Amino acid sequence: EPYYGNSEVKMPQIDSEWNLELMPNRSGQYWKVFVYKDLKYNALFTRSLGWNGGDGVFTTGLPDGNIFWSFNDSFYGVINENRSRGNCSFPRNSIMVQTPGEKDENLVWLADYVQTNDPNADRYYQVRTHIRHPKATLSDEKIQAGEIDQDYLYWAGDATIYNNQMQMLWGAVDNTDPNNLMRRFGTCLATYSLEGKPGDATYMKLISRNDNFNDHTLGYGDTMWEDEDGHIYLYTTSNYKVAVARTATRDLGSQWEYYVADPQGHFSWTTQYPSTQDAE
């Protein structure tokens, strides 16, 4: 059946300002599904220096109207004239704030650059990982030289605003076992200042971090929902199934409860961290 073969399926009404380009059947998707290429953000994130690609992207709206972005594995460095990557580093996480607007100057990269002065020298526009895991073994000397931890690292979870500060979850990852790479083994709760404006020393300054917040192997908080009932609902997946937890209050540091099933399949909330099977 043709992609638009059913006359009952109507094309979505897309605002032209969104600058989306329809991708009909590009991936062989179900014909009722409409997929678009985001030309606006393709243009915004087309780079020649600095950050030029990353995964694990999260955004959080901030009270001042800015948007906080976090990335996991990223590329920082030089892009050649033919759009291929030149010399790039591979920080395992990075952060940025977007001020209102869709121009390059609206992207404020909160990165620790190795050097930005000499394009002919090593590590030009390369950066260090934003937040390191305390078990990472590289020496300070190697970190200052621009090397990146590969053994223990943090990957981003979601973030929320509480008491005019930003709370963010960072998932601890163990890469030391070649037979069990990217093993989740805990969560860090980090708190950032929102005092001032982008570019100020106080803005998005890391105020505190609890690297031992929990030892969860499930990534609760990969996605969050701040509900009107006063809880934050924390979502993750396990074996292609959804697992859910929630906070007691809007503070991520408050007591967590987990939505688990009993042997009869009835779900309820419990403060006891569940087994993977119970969480599913």
Where do the protein language model's features map onto the residues?
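Beta-rich carbohydrate-recognition and catalytic domains
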Residues: Y3-N52, G61-Y152, I161-N214, E228-H231, ...
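Long, low-complexity, proline- and polar/charged-enriched segments
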Residues: T217-E228
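Hydrophobic core register within WD40 beta-propeller blades
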Residues: T59, A159, D222-M224
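Beta-rich catalytic cores
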Residues: G53-D55, L153-W155, L218-Y220
